[in-house]
């Protein structure tokens, strides 16, 4: 059965640059995939790489897909192209599914609201709460640590008691700064009058797993790995090295969805699913994986990424988005 593959690269601009310890992110580049079989069934997929997390670039994904031509199904996607593995496998899964369009976007209470880095988080947090989010995520390691810890203390004073806060350092802290942050987090988490800090995400670079394990054992506040576990291979490696803290998983850059689901079902890890700032096409596939891998009660989904771009693509269906490009 012939399956035709069509590709559409895209670029979309953040309304405001996303500030993280990796630096400002202004443009999200990606690649949409459309498959159609001889029966007229269609499947969409998305390649949404994050090269600074270790994935391939859009150019590498495009070169691979174009080089395959009509033979694209006869060659396995190399492990070095995890975002391409996700995109192609998701598109094939949708093509084979009876009807992918029974789609239900999760409610805001099930989604973690994303706050801008810096002091602006103080003004945006109430808006996220008003939108229904009860878990919020704040990027740290962007401004001087004394300023950020000062803003943290203001933020938790302003949040309702049932709020949960995730702090994401994107591997940008030194060991001393990570300890400074964990002291500040434990001070909040031992005060029953304040909101809870759910975890400190990727405090150190991925090559410092031993230090992060020690931090996890030395403080009350949990540590989550993100950049350390970007692919299924890295998930398995950290698991095999004994990591039992939180695993933040971005399905769009993790590689094969089937392999990811197998890892989840085999090990039942403490998982938080996270967006790669993909479009509706990648989002639906990633959230479908999260739904299959997250036993209730699941932690809030790290998919508060809609509305961060300067376009209206988040309001479109996959077919409408494909036609728009
Ligand atoms: O995880 C979330 O809640 C939202 C997604 C998110 O924070 C990220 C997506 C992609 C790259 C990073 O800037 C960032 C992260 O590090 O988790
Ligand atoms: Mg992160």
Residue ranges of each PLM-predicted region?
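N-terminal capping/lid subdomain adjacent to the active-site entrance of alpha/beta enzymes
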Residues: 1-166, 170-172, 176-179, 183-187, ...
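A short, flexible N-terminal coil/short beta segment enriched in small residues
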Residues: 75-91, 195-201, 206, 212-213
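Long, low-complexity, intrinsically disordered polar/charged segments
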Residues: 104, 108-109, 182-200, 238-248
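Short helix-capping segments at alpha-helix termini
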Residues: 158-163, 187-196, 218-221, 294-295
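Generic structural signal for hydrophobic
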Residues: 127-128, 152-155, 181, 185, ...
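Catalytic beta/alpha-barrel core
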Residues: 114-116, 136-145, 164-171, 193-208, ...
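Shared catalytic-loop signature of beta/alpha-barrel
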Residues: 67-71, 208-214, 218-222, 229-325
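Active-site-adjacent beta->alpha loops and helix N-cap segments on the catalytic face
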Residues: 119, 142-158, 173-177, 204-217, ...
């Amino acid at each position: 059965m012939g399956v035709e593959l069509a590709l559409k690269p895209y670029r979309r601009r953040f309304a405001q640059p996303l500030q993280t310890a990796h630096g400002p992110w202004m443009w999200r580049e990606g690649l949409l995939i459309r498959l159609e079989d001889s029966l007229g069934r269609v499947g969409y997929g998305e390649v949404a790489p994050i090269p600074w997390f270790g994935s391939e670039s859009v150019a590498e994904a495009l070169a691979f897909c174009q080089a395959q031509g009509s033979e694209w199904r006869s060659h396995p996607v190399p492990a070095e192209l995890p975002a391409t593995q996700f995109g192609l496998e998701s598109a094939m899964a949708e093509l084979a599914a009876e009807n992918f369009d029974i789609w239900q976007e999760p409610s805001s209470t099930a989604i973690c609201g994303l706050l801008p880095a810096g002091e602006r988080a103080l003004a945006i947090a109430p808006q996220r709460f008003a939108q229904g989010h009860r878990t919020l995520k704040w990027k740290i390691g962007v401004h001087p640590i004394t300023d950020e810890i000062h803003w943290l203390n203001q933020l938790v004073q302003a949040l309702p008691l049932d709020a949960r806060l995730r702090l994401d350092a994107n591997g940008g802290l030194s060991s001393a700064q990570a300890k400074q942050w964990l002291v500040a987090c434990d001070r909040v988490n031992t005060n029953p009058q304040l909101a809870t800090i759910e975890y400190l995400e990727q405090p150190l670079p991925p090559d410092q797993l031993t230090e992060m394990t020690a931090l996890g054992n030395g403080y009350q506040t949990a540590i989550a790995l993100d950049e350390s576990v970007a692919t299924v291979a890295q998930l398995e490696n950290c698991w095999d090295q004994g990591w039992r803290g939180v695993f933040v998983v971005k399905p769009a850059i993790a590689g094969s969805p089937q392999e990811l689901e197998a890892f989840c079902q085999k090990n039942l890890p403490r998982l938080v699913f996270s967006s790669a700032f993909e479009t509706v096409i990648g989002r639906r596939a990633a959230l479908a994986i999260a739904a299959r891998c997250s036993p209730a009660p699941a932690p809030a989904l790290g998919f508060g990424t809609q509305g961060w771009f300067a376009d209206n693509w988040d309001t479109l269906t996959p077919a409408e988005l494909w036609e728009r490009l």
